[in-house]
Amino acid sequence: MGSFLRSFRNNAGSTTPSVGAVPAKKEVPIPPMTPLEKRLLDMGSIRGDGSDKFYGMENYGNTCYCNSILQCLYYSVPFREAVINYPTRTPIESLEAALAKSLRYPNPNAHLEAEAQAEKQRAANAQRPGMPPAQPQKPEDKDSPDYKKKMALQTLPLLEAQNNATSYGMSESLFTSLKDIFESVVGSQSRIGIVRPQQFLDVLRRDHEMFRTAMHQDAHEFLNLLLNEVVANVEAEASKQPAAIEKSLPAPDHAETVDQSASSGSKTPNTTRWVHELFEGTLTSETQCLTCEKVSQRDEIFLDLSVDLEQHSSVTSCLRKFSAEEMLCERNKFHCDNCGGLQEAEKRMKIKRLPRILALHLKRFKYTEDLQRLQKLFHRVVYPYHLRLFNTTDDAEDPDRLYELYAVVVHIGGGPYHGHYVAIIKTEDRGWLLFDDELVEPVDKNYVRNFFGDKPGLACAYVLFYQETTLEAVMKEQEQENMESNLSATDTNEAALKPNGSSPSHLAHVHSASYIPSLEEHNRPNGLKRAPTAPQLSTHHEHGDPESGAFSPVTATPPVPPIPEHLSAAPIPPKSDVQGKKERAREEKERKAAEKEREKAEKLRRKEQEARAKENQRREEAELKAALEASKASKAQEDRRQSPDHGKDKLGGGLSRLKRGSKSFSQRLGKDKETRSVSSLEAPPLPIPGHPISRDGPIPEQHQQQPDPKDDPFQDSHHPNKPMMKEDEQANHKDPKHERTGHGKWRSFSLRKKSFSILS
């Protein structure tokens, strides 16, 4: 018995340290779930279209510009389906073999082992003799993005896309690298992970030298280059193998996937123009000559639309400024083919064909002359959730197309030569997500409003992605948001009403029954009914916002006494509510159609008024021109009528007077002031018959003075062939110069008055 007890005590003592003293066999704590994993808990089986995959992308130092654009393009459903299905899908066997090589699952405890190894190293260094004590390291902030990215790289599956172009009959290019990334993500069996786009970057740097350096790159420039490169690769491959491309139809094994893509609004590309059909739009440059008023048009193709920014503005105002009239004058005149020369003109830009996916580039970087470099503009520019473009031509296709915001590329930094890019993307059924390289986190819808440019910090929206939608889809989305906000408000109210964490079942039942009608009445006015022009959501909290209209526990309806069972199960009939919503939608549609007709009629009336005003202006100008011509003609006739009387004397006297006036005008100014004053005060006498009097204007001043006989070659004493005048004739000839002077001045005044009366 004693030996048995001793053995029992020994066994008990030996088992005590084995329970908690062996650290090697201690269970490793499971890392907590990330917010993204919590949001994906209720998802069903993995889909075949890749819409339920949420992968980050590894940053290789300065490749955030590439990661943000690739994420935005992947979550564009029609673009993703077009890339995957062109020219054909990769066979399942080849894709699975490639995924077996490229998909790697890291050790989930690698970060714990790395931390333990680092702790051991620090302890060993501290025990060495002569070594200074190590400074205590600051613990890492587990909420920082850098720590979360490091943890994601150590715990999530890593997917490295491989070159698989030969399996679908194409040569390696930037398009095939993009297709390999998309197909790898779609074909993987994990919903979350990290893509390593090393092969894509290698092809990009091989074909384009500007991306080989470690400099900061521009996300908008990369987007434009990528779309043009995809178009070039697809068209080049189609020209090599036209017959193979035409015969590449969907195989029976993935017809279900094609049906899913068609139901989601995307189309399988049967031609090489699928990039043009998605992103391409047409701009029309209208130039009107102000001389002949002829309008000339020139079409331009765009894959993205770049707009200038103004302080405290919106995307709508920026687009209005983009299509504003520009005056072409001075050195920037327009060469009119109709007029045959440079003329002043008015120029405006309008959209003739709208793209299905609208990429709006906000020009945040502007060149300044004083700094001699680009500078970032921190202007506040508001962008809506829903957008309608108004600056379209009269013959535009589908001018009332409605767009919804589905992605925003944000630039974080103080200038164009450094910074960081992230993407905020709206997924199909998981709301808005933040893609920050390796980090993927769910965010609230209002989080998108933080990048207008007026918030503290350096983060501003840089590229906006809008995709086409319908009014019914917008209304359905708003109803879903209202329902979710109401459910969350109900849960909050019920939690607030629970005494000590428990609630009787009958109280919860009565509370929900009495609370439903008030919620339905509260949700009756929606955001679409408030918008007069477009069903766009406001960018600020308003009364109808689900976020701002949610009930709080303070304003919750208090519990009421139990009511009969037949009353508690009587909610508002859903059919009538649905019919009412359909009627409201139909009325809204009819009202918008009527407004559109009125706007067209008003535009036509304004055009007619402008045409009439221009016609009146032209007629008035013609009448004025005719009056001027008539005045000139009458003046010429009068001159011709008066010239035969004294043409010879007038011509000779005029020339002699001009000669004498130009010779001694300054000398004769001081002579005989008395004579000039007396002659100027005398009344103009009548002209002597037979005496030549100038009628074409005032006589020069030298005729008011006695000319020097030596200087005057026309004096009687210097003409030997002319007889001498008598004394009475000389007496009568003494005043004619004054008569000529006064009469000439008077006649000149009368002629001028007459000419002015004709002009008036």
UniProtKB/Swiss-Prot annotation:
Keywords: Coiled coil, Hydrolase, Protease, Thiol protease, Ubl conjugation pathway. InterPro entries: Papain-like_cys_pep_sf, Peptidase_C19, Peptidase_C19_UCH, USP_CS, USP_dom. It catalyses: Thiol-dependent hydrolysis of ester, thioester, amide, peptide and isopeptide bonds formed by the C-terminal Gly of ubiquitin (a 76-residue protein attached to proteins as an intracellular targeting signal). One of its GO terms (cellular component) is nucleus. The keyword Protease applies. Residues 1-28, 114-146, 242-270, 520-760 are annotated as: Disordered. Residues 743-760 have a biased composition (Basic residues). GO terms for biological process: carbon catabolite repression of transcription; protein deubiquitination; ubiquitin-dependent protein catabolic process. Pfam families: UCH. Residues 578-626, 635-651, 708-742 have a biased composition (Basic and acidic residues). The active site is at residues 64, 420. Its EC number is 3.4.19.12. Residues 8-18, 258-270 have a biased composition (Polar residues). Interacts with creA, creC and qutD. Belongs to the peptidase C19 family. PANTHER family: RE52890P (PTHR24006:SF733), UBIQUITIN CARBOXYL-TERMINAL HYDROLASE (PTHR24006). This is Probable ubiquitin carboxyl-terminal hydrolase creB. It comes from Aspergillus clavatus (strain ATCC 1007 / CBS 513.65 / DSM 816 / NCTC 3887 / NRRL 1 / QM 1276 / 107). The gene is creB.
